[in-house]
Amino acid sequence: GNIVYSDGFYKNAYNAKKVGTEKGAGLRWTTQWQISRTVTADNTAAFNYSQNGGYEYEYVGSGIINYNDTCFYRRNTVRDALTVKWRARHFTLSSITSFQHITDNLTLDQDFLPLSYFTLTQAIHESSLTQDIVARGKAGFYTWLGGLFGFYKTTRMRAPVTLKDDGIATLITDRVNNNDKIPVMIGFDNPEIPLQSYFRMPTWGV
């Protein structure tokens, strides 16, 4: 296993908190079985976690890291692989089955200002399953190799952009209400406008 930690090198002037922090951990475990004289199995499982707190991004106009909304990146990964081998008299047959699941979340104060313009989130859930079957002839005057491979992967992504009160005022209401050619005044009861987007992307092959 392993553990990673860093408390960052820069501070956000808005709240005096450090940005660029990092923490994570990983664990890997392998188990082997001698099922019989000719059959063996090997399983490896792994888990990894990492989280970064904020980003050392600054607005070019000020040259200062100074933003008010939450920023972070978080990722979890689970992997497992099972290998089973059968050693026959004239060939070896192997089955390799693997599974992986990833969840990550990237959330940004997209304007990187101490004002509430808009934020972005990109959250991904991805699962994949693979199966590999390999037959291999034993050494002799000649040898041979054959196999079959298949996989399935599905990715679900949620990527909302949230327009916040300063962004609503600057981009929408002020432009309309200060335009003499538009005979109406507009306003929003909700200080936030979420613009939702969702994607599902399955992939498979043999």
Q: Where do the protein language model's features map onto the residues?
A:
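Periplasmic-side early beta-strands and strand-to-turn transitions of outer-membrane beta-barrels
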Residues: 1-71, 75, 102-116, 123
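Face-selective signature of the C-terminal outer-membrane beta-barrel domain
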Residues: 40-46, 77-104, 120-206
